[in-house]
Structures are given as C-alpha cells and as structure tokens.
Amino acid sequence: MLLLLVPVLEVIFTLGGTRAQSVTQLDSHVSVSEGTPVLLRCNYSSSYSPSLFWYVQHPNKGLQLLLKYTSAATLVKGINGFEAEFKKSETSFHLTKPSAHMSDAAEYFCVVS
C-alpha cells in the first residue's frame, strides 16, 4: 500500500489588496495500492484567471514541478503519468494518475498564482 501525503493547507495570496486567491487541498492523507488510480483533490478561489500548479516533494528532496495550467487546454499532462483537469465551473484542479507506483509516495502541493 502506498501512502501519498497531501498536506492540508490553505494558501492565500493578496496582491495589492484587491486580487485575492486561495487554494485548498481537501485530503490530508491518501493511501492507495500499487497499480490503482490516484486522485488528489484541489479547489481554488481566484478573482481572475488563475495559473495553477502541482508540485511533488519526495523524502529528503526539493520541490519538483509536476504540471501547470496557464489558460491553455483544460487537461494538463505532467511528468510520470500525472495529469490534472482544470474545471472553472467547479473551481477545481484535481491531480490524477491511472496507476500508482511505489515511487509516487511523497507530499503533493497544489498552488495558485
């Protein structure tokens, strides 16, 4: 069984006091069996068109960018088989992978900019 840590965090950015953004990761810990699908949920709030990112941090390593959304296609493909779908109507940017591997055990961070 794999344990994917998704820190419960809410990040709020205020730029000039008029444009506030926040992101909320809904799961604090996600456990999956190797070979099964992974879903890491992220919802955001933004007063304008956001740029959204998913980062991963493996034990004793620095942050690594998995993928980013910057207003192009709604389905974003990242590294190592991860992808995320931007759903403006649901204000979500959930990270998915069809088949988890032991090497995916790490902390994952959703960021809005």
Swiss-Prot record:
Protein name in the entry: T cell receptor alpha variable 8-2
Keywords noted in UniProt: Adaptive immunity, Cell membrane, Disulfide bond, Glycoprotein, Immunity, Immunoglobulin domain, Membrane, Receptor, Signal, T cell receptor
Annotated Ig-like domain residues: 21-113
Entry's Gene Ontology BP terms: adaptive immune response
The keyword Cell membrane belongs to this UniProt entry's keyword annotation: yes
Gene Ontology CC terms, in alphabetical order: T cell receptor complex
Signal sequence region: 1-20
Species in which this protein is naturally found: Homo sapiens
Disulfide bonds: C42-C110
Function recorded in the entry: V region of the variable domain of T cell receptor (TR) alpha chain that participates in the antigen recognition. Alpha-beta T cell receptors are antigen specific receptors which are essential to the immune response and are present on the cell surface of T lymphocytes. Recognize peptide-major histocompatibility (MH) (pMH) complexes that are displayed by antigen presenting cells (APC), a prerequisite for efficient T cell adaptive immunity against pathogens.
Domain of life: Eukaryota
Pfam family, one: V-set
Gene that encodes the chain: TRAV8-2
InterPro entries per record: Ig-like_dom, Ig-like_dom_sf, Ig-like_fold, Ig_V-set, TCR_variable_region
Subcellular location: Cell membrane
Glycosylation sites: N43
Subunit structure: Alpha-beta TR is a heterodimer composed of an alpha and beta chain; disulfide-linked. The alpha-beta TR is associated with the transmembrane signaling CD3 coreceptor proteins to form the TR-CD3 (TcR or TCR). The assembly of alpha-beta TR heterodimers with CD3 occurs in the endoplasmic reticulum where a single alpha-beta TR heterodimer associates with one CD3D-CD3E heterodimer, one CD3G-CD3E heterodimer and one CD247 homodimer forming a stable octameric structure. CD3D-CD3E and CD3G-CD3E heterodimers preferentially associate with TR alpha and TR beta chains, respectively.
PANTHER family cross-referenced by the UniProt entry: T CELL RECEPTOR ALPHA VARIABLE 8-2, T-CELL RECEPTOR ALPHA CHAIN V REGION
